[in-house]
């Protein structure tokens, strides 16, 4: 019964991400497409998205997550290494951008100021809060052994990949590997700072590559 209740709460958090934060994004991008000032739209977006992040973060803080020491979180450098290796592997894969990546590319080229805040700042904040923080808080609050932690990492990685709308197996694996490294970052520090920072670094690299190439 408690598991079903917690599942319901997590789904509510997920729906808030999809519909409330999604509405904020659509409102901003539609306004830009209609010719509104990029500065005004970005300012409004930062304000609305900031309120959403604050509310979800306060919600996340209401209950602790217990994570025991294991092979998955023993080394603080492991998440960064996994992320770096997955990044290197992508350079040798065929160019196969997902719909989500293509949208991000087009948005970055058309509206770099807005895109910086959307992609580099708020995407890491919102996605880490939901797919690491709220997932752990409600469905994996007591990770007492390696099996529970591994299950959290796998579920987190799969959900993270699916939310980015992969159209091929390669796209799914790219997002899942990123999600796995971010999950490792979350459990290694038993909090969101590391995973948000690593996620922001990943998106910053992509953002700069789009602008420079």
Question: Residue ranges of each PLM-predicted region?
Answer:
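Transmembrane helix-loop-helix hairpins at the membrane interface
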Residues: 112-213
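Alpha-helical transmembrane segments in multi-pass membrane proteins
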Residues: 3-59
